[in-house]
Amino acid sequence: MKVFDYEDVQLIPNKCIVNSRSECDTTVILGKHAFKMPIVPANMQTIINEPIAEFLAENGYFYIMHRFNGSTRIPFVKKMKERQWISSISVGVKKEEYLLIEELAKQGLTPDYITIDIAHGHSNSVIEMIQRIKTRLPETFVIAGNVGTPEAVRELENAGADATKVGIGPGKVCITKIKTGFGTGGWQLAALRWCAKAARKPIIADGGIRTHGDIAKSIRFGATMVMIGSLFAGHEESSGETKIENGVAYKEYFGSASEFQKGEKKNVEGKKIWIQHKGSLKDTLVEMQQDLQSSISYAGGRDLEAIRKVDYVIVKNSIFNGDTI
């Protein structure tokens, strides 16, 4: 198996057929809904909150609300349905999460999307949760993860998952590979390719995205949607503390398995960093879309499908050629 990561790959351009990149369509379909771009902010507490979720839903972007304020999920689903926006929440696999599914079913609330969100998604506990959701809320689109092997993808799909989330510890604030010796950190793009070849349903690439060009690379190697953490951290709208150092503003960004999220130093596989303030989330989304439109134009097409067909080269660690962004 070829092993490589985002910084090792460059996509090879095809003849451009559009007059302007603005003609290129970045729309993606996931389940019953179309979204403006194949990107989704990570379902982490310092990345997504209710106001951001509402902004994304209102403006045609996909989102997944995090699961760390458990009691707010049913009111959140109600609110989003009242506003006729998509409802998309996360669950774990503990007993209280089964009670949540039962309560949603009892109240006749069917979220459009539920993401089963645990670090090691290739497990009996995730399979059982998939089956419970599909039994009690059969119309809900279920995303399950996280996984890093074709066997895991097939098993979760066979259990009823509508999409799988691929990535074990490649994120900027994840230290799974250091703490455990396991993961897809350092070869996330190759793992995505490996898993996508086995998949019959959509794959969400999760982790390791450091530049906007990495979104196009994820699409090329089989992702339908790309989950992004660090590039969405540090915005005006982001949750988390702000600090000022030498006149420069920074915002905190921590992993879901960090002691800052857990509230205790137990089974820690995440850390906290400070991200320089980036301004408005809206501006970042516009720039991402423009860059992805450029990617489509370089691929020689008019929509995302063109990116899936381009050739590529593997040139280890040479993408920046000594430059920094």
Swiss-Prot record:
Gene Ontology terms describing biological process: purine nucleotide metabolic process
Domain of life: Bacteria
InterPro entries documented for this protein: Aldolase_TIM, GMP_reductase, GuaC_type_2, IMP_DH/GMP_Rdtase_CS, IMP_DH_GMPRt
Broad EC category: oxidoreductase
Reaction(s) this enzyme catalyzes, per UniProt: IMP + NH4(+) + NADP(+) = GMP + NADPH + 2 H(+)
CDD domains the record matches: IMPDH (cd00381)
Catalytic residues (UniProt): C174 (thioimidate intermediate)
Coiled-coil regions listed in the entry: none
CC per GO annotation: cytosol; GMP reductase complex
MF (Gene Ontology): GMP reductase activity
Keywords: NADP, Oxidoreductase
Residues annotated as binding NADP(+): 203-226
EC number: 1.7.1.7
Recorded family membership: Belongs to the IMPDH/GMPR family. GuaC type 2 subfamily.
Biological role: Catalyzes the irreversible NADPH-dependent deamination of GMP to IMP. It functions in the conversion of nucleobase, nucleoside and nucleotide derivatives of G to A nucleotides, and in maintaining the intracellular balance of A and G nucleotides.
Record-linked NCBIfam families: GMP_reduct_2 (TIGR01306), PRK05458.1 (NF003966)
Protein name (database record): GMP reductase
Organism: Helicobacter pylori (strain HPAG1)
Gene: guaC
